[in-house]
Amino acid sequence: MASSSAPDENEFQFGCPPAPCQDPSEPRVLCCTACLSENLRDDEDRICPKCRADNLHPVSPGSPLTQEKVHSDVAEAEIMCPFAGVGCSFKGSPQSMQEHEATSQSSHLYLLLAVLKEWKSSPGSNLGSAPMALERNLSELQLQAAVEATGDLEVDCYRAPCCESQEELALQHLVKEKLLAQLEEKLRVFANIVAVLNKEVEASHLALAASIHQSQLDREHILSLEQRVVELQQTLAQKDQVLGKLEHSLRLMEEASFDGTFLWKITNVTKRCHESVCGRTVSLFSPAFYTAKYGYKLCLRLYLNGDGSGKKTHLSLFIVIMRGEYDALLPWPFRNKVTFMLLDQNNREHAIDAFRPDLSSASFQRPQSETNVASGCPLFFPLSKLQSPKHAYVKDDTMFLKCIVDTSA
């Protein structure tokens, strides 16, 4: 109640006046509808005749009733804020005062808290009416806040203890509740984000697992292909060997003769002689030839640096009996006369030597391996005459040897 002096604690129980209006000409504090209903029900005589004569309309729960409702003659008078005693300087009509009190509760609490702190810091000061007025104002403000928040007509009017620690705790509680609400909102947002990230991580894990599985399948397929390539390479190598043998056989068949006469062309004579002297290639084998289509299989063996008694002095030329496909049908030992010729490419004077096989020699028996031991003429032709200018035994680094096997016998 905004007056010159604060009322006694027992003058108005619960911080509200005993009647809605006792002195219409004086601004009154707001009275909640709960107190108003209680006053109207308990004692109608306390309502002034002017208020009783007016038709009071029912008010909604939690709505404050002021003198503006019943005394129109003072509706426009300016009144001071009930918290003027603690520093609030607002003045205005009852309607604006109602709006001010509804919107300035926080500032009123801070004003009360400042006065309480100052009062608590001065324990020897007057403890009379000022603390009681502050306590009632605080009770009224808390009561109005409770009524507006709940809308309950049965809210009890109470007076909170004037205690700095409780007010500080209340403010801290409000701050913490606001902070908690903000944190809960952030937590909800983060929970949604985490849920989305979890789905993405799960999808990534599934994709990674699928990729690993596919990689394993690809690796196995690659190993299978590599094994297949190795097998194909081996098969190709075998076919190359077979093809090489066929080509060699074909070449031999093209070079071979089947009448007992064989002409052997030797190229790169200088190089071959040098290799023979160095021991790199001691001897040369000629392609095979035959005495007949189904006759003996033979070849020549030449030592360019000599062999045996003709080593380093003569060309040594031998005949080799080879194992043939038709040996079982042929007479043994081999007994045909053999003639060797080193051809003079100027057709002047050929070098000729001949011999008959030694029937007791193993060289002319039926071969038990691929070839028998070579036999022939170790002193076939002197090396000193090989490059003779009078003859063309070697021409264009090429020489020709001829073998004639007598097949008439």
Swiss-Prot record:
Localization of this protein: Cytoplasm
One GO term of the biological process aspect: apoptotic process
Domain remarks: The coiled coil domain mediates homo- and hetero-oligomerization.
Lineage: Eukaryota, Metazoa, Chordata, Craniata, Vertebrata
Species name: Mus musculus (Mouse)
Function as written in the Swiss-Prot or TrEMBL entry: Adapter molecule that regulates the activation of NF-kappa-B and JNK. Plays a role in the regulation of cell survival and apoptosis. The heterotrimer formed by TRAF1 and TRAF2 is part of a E3 ubiquitin-protein ligase complex that promotes ubiquitination of target proteins, such as MAP3K14. The TRAF1/TRAF2 complex recruits the antiapoptotic E3 protein-ubiquitin ligases BIRC2 and BIRC3 to TNFRSF1B/TNFR2.
Keyword Flavoprotein found: no
CDD domains noted in UniProt: MATH_TRAF1 (cd03779)
Placement of covalent cross-link Glycyl lysine isopeptide (Lys-Gly) (interchain with G-Cter in ubiquitin): K178, K186
Phenotype of null mutants: No visible phenotype. Mice have normal B-cell proliferation and antibody response, but increased T-cell proliferation in response to CD3 signaling. Their T-cells show enhanced activation of JNK and NF-kappa-B. Mice are highly susceptible to TNF-induced skin necrosis.
Protein name as catalogued: TNF receptor-associated factor 1
